[in-house]
């Protein structure tokens, strides 16, 4: 059996899909379906069981036996960069992750988990997996950073795989439940379908992010598991592309609409990553050689899926 926490969420459900595609259907999905709309991410997937997050944590803390577990993909977390309830964030993203990590280490179960490019904060260069480059801008980024630090301290004595992935700007199928936290491509597509012009924040032509297609993220997770590689790795394309490039890809797909700019929100000033670009040196050195989709390629594939499924 494989456990995928956050398995009904965006990246988690795409990992379940990738597992299904290699013939692996014995998957325990752990999630919180208080937002009932997330069920839609699981409808076309094969899983063997579902468990509520709170029940799962209680079982982990109690040391319950789940039988043979081949791996845990820990994608479950609060991923809102605008959530400022620090206690909630640390309980959800840090304490929970520690409990699960120790459970896996004690049983030599491979543990692969979601970190984030938010650990790098507001820098504009050197997105490198090293302490000197890490300075998160919000409590979400801090919760991920602190767990990475915790993992670093344990890695030298770990007898089983521990692998963290610093996800950059992920977009693609199964993110619709994320609302305001869904990708720019998702929102621009919705605006055009509603008969509106697509809108970006003023200055967006100067904002560049490392946008990575979720199918590529799932592929990275599976490769590292199958190759038993430990460490903390950036998971991006290594290319910074502008929000303008995303809107160009959306407009190109729809063949209609004209880009509009709206004022940049006051509440995001100073707390917004204007530039991200993954340094892939360590990822490539670990042996991962697959190419990553460009924004033009990934957005086109995503919009074909999105406009067929919604």
Curated annotation (Swiss-Prot):
Reactions mediated catalytically: ADP-D-glycero-beta-D-manno-heptose = ADP-L-glycero-beta-D-manno-heptose
Known cofactor(s): NADP(+)
Alphabetized UniProt keyword annotations: Carbohydrate metabolism, Isomerase, NADP
Cofactor remark: Binds 1 NADP(+) per subunit.
Organism: Sodalis glossinidius (strain morsitans)
Entry protein name: ADP-L-glycero-D-manno-heptose-6-epimerase
UniProt-annotated catalytic positions: 140 (proton acceptor), 178 (proton acceptor)
Enzyme class: isomerase
GO biological process entries: ADP-L-glycero-beta-D-manno-heptose biosynthetic process; carbohydrate metabolic process
Binding site for NADP(+): 10-11, 31-32, 38, 53, 75-79, 92, 144, 170, 178
Subunit structure and binding partners: Homopentamer.
The enzyme's E.C. designation: 5.1.3.20
Binding-site list for substrate: 169, 180, 187, 201-204, 209, 272
A Pfam family reported for this protein in Swiss-Prot or TrEMBL: Epimerase
GO MF term list: ADP-glyceromanno-heptose 6-epimerase activity; NADP binding
Domain commentary: Contains a large N-terminal NADP-binding domain, and a smaller C-terminal substrate-binding domain.
Record's keyword annotation contains Transmembrane helix: no
Function, as annotated: Catalyzes the interconversion between ADP-D-glycero-beta-D-manno-heptose and ADP-L-glycero-beta-D-manno-heptose via an epimerization at carbon 6 of the heptose.
